[in-house]
C-alpha cells in the first residue's frame, strides 16, 4: 500500500508496529517455530482453542516480519544493491513456465544465489528458531527507531510512539487474561502464560462475578483494575461451569509488549540511503507527510 501511494510512511510504520505488537503479545512465539506453524497450520492454527495464544504463532504475522527482516538484511549486506524484490523476481523468472513447485529448502538456496550473500544462519534464526526476532537492531540499520513499552490500556494495539516518561506504564496493573462479554458477564476467553490469572488458578471459560466483594461487569472491569497497583491481592469470585469458586489473585505489572516505530532523527548517510531504498521516499518527503 505504501508503494502504491494508498498510505504514507507514518501510516505504514503504524500498521507495521501493530503487526509486531500482535506477535509480541503471544507467548506462542517462544514455543513454536515459524516453520512448524506453517507445517501444523491445518491441525492447529485453523483449529485454535483457549490455549492457542500460549502455544501457537501465526505464520501470517510472524511470517511477514521474517520477510521484512530478510529484505532489510539483504539491503544492508549488499549496500542497497539487492533486496527481497530481486529474489521474488528471480523466482518468478525461474518457475514461470515450470510445472514443478519450489522445493522445501530450494527457495533459501535460490535466495543466496540471487543475492550472492550467505543467508543460511539468518534463515535458521527466522524459520527454525523460537529466538526473539532482531527487529530493533535491524530497523536501526535503516534509520528506524523501535519503542517497546507496556500498553497504555487494553485498547492500545500499538503504533503510537510515546515521548513522555514510560515508567508510569510499567506500574499499570493487569490480570493477564483476555475477556469477552457473555450475557452481561465477564467471561475469560484466554488465560495468558505467566500472568496473574494463571498464577491464581483461573481458567478459560471461567465467568468473573466479583472482585473484593464488588460485582464486576464488562463495563467496570478495567476501571476496577486501574485503581489498584501491581502487587495488590484481590479476592476473586468466579463460576467455573456451575461451581462458585474463589481465588486470591496478585496483580502483576503490564509487560513491555507494545511496539511503536518512527523515523530516526540522527540517522547517518548510509542509513538514510537504505531507508530511502526501502520506503521509496527521501527523508524530506517522508517527514513532510
Predicted segment positions?
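An active-site-proximal "capping" alpha-helix that borders the catalytic cofactor pocket
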Residues: 1-2
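C-terminal recognition in membrane/secretory proteostasis and scaffolding
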Residues: 6-289
Amino acid at each position: 500500500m505504501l508503494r502504491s501511494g494508498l498510505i504514507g510512511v507514518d501510516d505504514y510504520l503504524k500498521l507495521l508496529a501493530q503487526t509486531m505488537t500482535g506477535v509480541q503479545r503471544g507467548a506462542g512465539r517462544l514455543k513454536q517455530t515459524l516453520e512448524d506453524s506453517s507445517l501444523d497450520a491445518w491441525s492447529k492454527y485453523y483449529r485454535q482453542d483457549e490455549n492457542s495464544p500460549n502455544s501457537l504463532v501465526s505464520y501470517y504475522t510472524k511470517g511477514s516480519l521474517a520477510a521484512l527482516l530478510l529484505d532489510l538484511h539483504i539491503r544492508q549486506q549488499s549496500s542497497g544493491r539487492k533486496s527481497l524484490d530481486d529474489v521474488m523476481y528471480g523466482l518468478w523468472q525461474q518457475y514461470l513456465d515450470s510445472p514443478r513447485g519450489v522445493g522445501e529448502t530450494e527457495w533459501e538456496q535460490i535466495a543466496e544465489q540471487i543475492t550472492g550473500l550467505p543467508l543460511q544462519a539468518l534463515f535458521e534464526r527466522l524459520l527454525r528458531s523460537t529466538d526473539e526476532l532482531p527487529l530493533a537492531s535491524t530497523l536501526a540499520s535503516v534509520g528506524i527507531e523501535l519503542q517497546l513499552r507496556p500498553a497504555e490500556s487494553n485498547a492500545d494495539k500499538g503504533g503510537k510512539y510515546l515521548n513522555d516518561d514510560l515508567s508510569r506504564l510499567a506500574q499499570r496493573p493487569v490480570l493477564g487474561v483476555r475477556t469477552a462479554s457473555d450475557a452481561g458477564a465477564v467471561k475469560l476467553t484466554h488465560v495468558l502464560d505467566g500472568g496473574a490469572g494463571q498464577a491464581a488458578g483461573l481458567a478459560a471459560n471461567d465467568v468473573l462475578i466479583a472482585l473484593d466483594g464488588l460485582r464486576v461487569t464488562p463495563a467496570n472491569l478495567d476501571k476496577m483494575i486501574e485503581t489498584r497497583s501491581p502487587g495488590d491481592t484481590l479476592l476473586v469470585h468466579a463460576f467455573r461451569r456451575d461451581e462458585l469458586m474463589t481465588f486470591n489473585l496478585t496483580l502483576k505489572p503490564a509487560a513491555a509488549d507494545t511496539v511503536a516505530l518512527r523515523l530516526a532523527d540522527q540517522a547517518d548517510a548510509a542509513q538514510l540511503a537504505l531507508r530511502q531504498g526501502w520506503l521509496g521516499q527521501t527523508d524530506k518527503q517522508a517527514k513532510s507527510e
